[in-house]
Amino acid sequence: MFLAFALSTKAMAKEPKGTLTLRVMTYNLRYGELASLEQLAAHIKAFQPDFVALEEVDCFTKREDTPHQHNKDFISTLAYETGMFGLYGKTIAYRGGWYGIGLLTKHPYINMEKVLLPNPENKEPRALLYATCEVGTDTIVFAVTHLDVNSSKTRALQAETISRQLEKSPYPVVIGGDFNAPPSESTIAKIMLPRWFNATDNAPTCPTWEPKVKIDYLFCRPQARWQLITTQVVQSRLSDHLPVISTMQLLPRR
């Protein structure tokens, strides 16, 4: 397996007392077409993340182009192989099984919820999946999404729905996902960035063989309580997206 690490550091500071440090990853798996689940799990596990947001996650499907993944439960296998808890959110029935998004968490979860996102053009359904997790003495909401690929207007509606839903949380929130939008699009520039802490940089994440565009992100709220320590786009060929992993700190309430 070829791995090269492109590390960019955006902030370095002494850790205040009571600060919580988290390592979080987002990874679009391309429904396991380019790698085995064991390879993907080993790749994830190597970074020892606290949370992983996963997109294009199959369960019991039988795709013609992925015979090596037939009838496999992606999230359960990845959870077992990484030693993490796994949560799954189906978005569509597909090829004898389901297709959707998932979460891996090193920390126990209290509850979870799936919210279907606006779909005005009646295209592929999209969802927000989130879980409330206990991290030591702290409580964190961790979320994943995968926005519409066709319409910037639909993506903006979906991002607005996500923001409004998660802004209700009494706890700090981290969301990762494939937003299918470059940083300049209103989905990111006018909806996410003004209201969320950006826990990545603008390094391109897709496609793996010649990265040209950034569409994979990690965001946190409330903005004032988060500090980014490192962020990296990992060069690998196990999917058509490059995984993004960031280490961030949740600062104490002032």
Question: Predicted segment positions?
Answer:
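Active-site regions of metal-assisted phosphoester/phosphodiester hydrolases
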Residues: 11-51, 85-88, 92-254
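Short, flexible/disordered intra-domain loops and linkers
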Residues: 59-72
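Bacterial N-terminal signal peptides
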Residues: 1-6
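Charged, glycine-enriched surface loops/patches
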Residues: 74-84, 104
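Acidic/histidine-rich, surface-exposed loop or edge segments in extracytoplasmic proteins
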Residues: 24-26, 53-62
